[in-house]
């Protein structure tokens, strides 16, 4: 960024006028909608005016241009002022602002990516800065471009721990292309924010995390211009002391006005008061960006070579994941890996070894890791793969939920699933993860059962839109597929079948191998079973499951290393509900487990070979 040049008085007045027009638009829109957050918008008016019409470089009619500076409104409830900015810039018709929150309009109550100027959905507070960190990391280390990233946070959301995870990340990686603006307007939703206007404490906290920190009067366009003009070799935090409801007589800095639109009569009077301060209707044109971001193509990324496993050899799917990701990294320099200090367990360390410049260590901060991945994936700049123990992704469920709302394309690999991890005990065992990821809109849930399937899952995930989850296991199990086996999303595999099959058994990961062992044991009793590998739990191959059930007298037995709720059994039951003559019997983990050897735990919770044998015999005996 060039050195600071003080704007002349004409430019400063134009910025003041712009801020007041943004105030007016925010009040008009929320009053027309009958809901919204005008006071939260008004505290940020000067910040937004200076950012978009003095500091940022972007093409106003092409908001997602890869060269543009980025902006994340972490305090998403102030969406009306963001919409007002894009109307002021000429991208939105001003009349559209009056359709705020209507079902016929794209201007939702909080920012969402159906708006071309919104990269990530916000509104669940505390997440915007993490996404901004991902954008800034991508700009600095992958794109090596001059675009900068700005994120505005409210003081209420600074109580969220995820904010400080992001602050730490930016400080560690010296993201000097990132600016966080803290709108310290003193008031939260139901009470004052904990620090109110103690801006010096905010400053000390930010500095402790490695940020260059500046305190400003958030309603002084001159102070804001100067603060944004300071370039340092570290991220910058601007602590802007503001007043909630600034410019609204009788409401400014008053409690009990959060999320309340002004009544029509009051709004008209306030708008007249604010408008009387506007000296010129002339609008400031956006400054175009420097066009130095590289052209990127992340479509159709394929493995450079087929799998190279041997049927019968043993490998844990968690290790197969690391090998597959490292291999895929050679197909595109836009494949990146993130981990939460578990890379020697998830085997993402294999990717780091071969592609060290594309590995991001996020440390033990899973919420932030997911937000970083979302930021890295914006504008199709990268294809991120995040990994940690599957159990620890539960901590980041809100970030994953918001990633889906953001229409983000990120891939999450959770290792150490189920009781089969053994001695580490229940705190490390993922037993809720299938339920969690199945509930995410438009998600794809992979559950590979050998090394070949894992490699195919990684390749498919890289080319599948939405949130992809790959569930991997700790135990080593045999390779059961040939290297040329074709895998597709939503296509299950019949691993074992005969014309005399009496029960269809569906397992995945460890339990698929237990099912195959059970099939061998049942042969002694002249009982044949059909064994299915679903490969993806979502979407599920309903047709193959039903065809198999009909061929085995309508009997389905599911067995899974997961709790009963939300797992494979419930997915299969939902898929076949209403089908005459088809019944589903389920085996799953029924209570909080304990430490023990994997085989002991599989037996204790009734999901091992012997439990499958007994369940099959029971179904056959019933007739």
From Swiss-Prot:
Thiamine diphosphate binds at residues 40, 77, 123-125, 156, 185, 244, 258, 392, 428. Its EC number is 2.2.1.1. GO terms for biological process: glyceraldehyde-3-phosphate biosynthetic process; pentose-phosphate shunt; pentose-phosphate shunt, non-oxidative branch; regulation of growth; xylulose 5-phosphate biosynthetic process. The active site is at residue 366. The modification N6-acetyllysine is found at residues 6, 11, 144, 204, 232, 241, 260, 538, 603. It comes from the Eukaryota. Its cofactor is Mg(2+); Ca(2+); Mn(2+); Co(2+). One of its GO terms (molecular function) is protein homodimerization activity. Substrate binds at residues 37, 258, 318, 345, 416, 424, 474. It holds the Pfam family Transketolase_N. GO terms for cellular component: cytosol; myelin sheath; nuclear body. The keyword DNA damage does not apply. The keyword Ribonucleoprotein does not apply. There is a cross-link at residue 352 (Glycyl lysine isopeptide (Lys-Gly) (interchain with G-Cter in SUMO2)). Keywords: Acetylation, Calcium, Isopeptide bond, Magnesium, Metal-binding, Phosphoprotein, Thiamine pyrophosphate, Transferase, Ubl conjugation. Disulfide bonds: none annotated. Mg(2+) binds at residues 155, 185, 187. Homodimer. This is Transketolase. It comes from Mus musculus.
